[in-house]
Amino acid sequence: MAKIDEQDILKRIQDPQSRRRAFEEIVNVYSRQLYWKIHYMMQNHDDTDDVLQNTFIKAWKGLENFKGDSAIFTWLYRIAYNESLTFLKQRKQMTSIDDEDFVEQASFVADEYFDGDNTQELLMQAVSTLPAKQRQVFCMKYFEDKKYEEISDLVGTSVGALKASYHIAVEKITNFIKSKE
């Protein structure tokens, strides 16, 4: 991933003449990383693309108000996280399915980027059964090895709540895998 000079980007964002080009750089640098963060929650390429597009639209609309109190990626991730949750809530309301049906429909579908063995596939199936927020916490902690404090900053939840959520997710995943063996 290419690096950007955040101070330079902040200056250019404030100038209407250079705002569009600065935003294009932000999109180019962070879109792939955001895609995979969103994909952890969506578990579907098309939905991930929709949420990613909504994330950048919302970021563009709020760009001139971004003051740099957090890193650009943290700001974008927070938007993406909220957009993901909104999307999942709307999808659940539109389809009006109960939780058991949702779990069945959310089963992991291997895509072209996934070529793991049976254990990895079982893990991904188990992860896909978790509620969206819990799945995101688990993925950031387990797959990305993020510290609880960093996850807390990204999702706006206390460290204690994150630890509890992660612990419950691990229990659910363990039980899921044991039931399939």
Predicted regions mapped to residue ranges:
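Structural recognition of an alpha-helix C-terminal capping motif at a helix-to-coil junction
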Residues: D50-I57, S70-N82
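Sigma70-family region 2
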Residues: Y40-Q43, N54-A71, Q90-K92
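DNA-recognition helix of helix-turn-helix
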Residues: L85, Q134, D153-K180
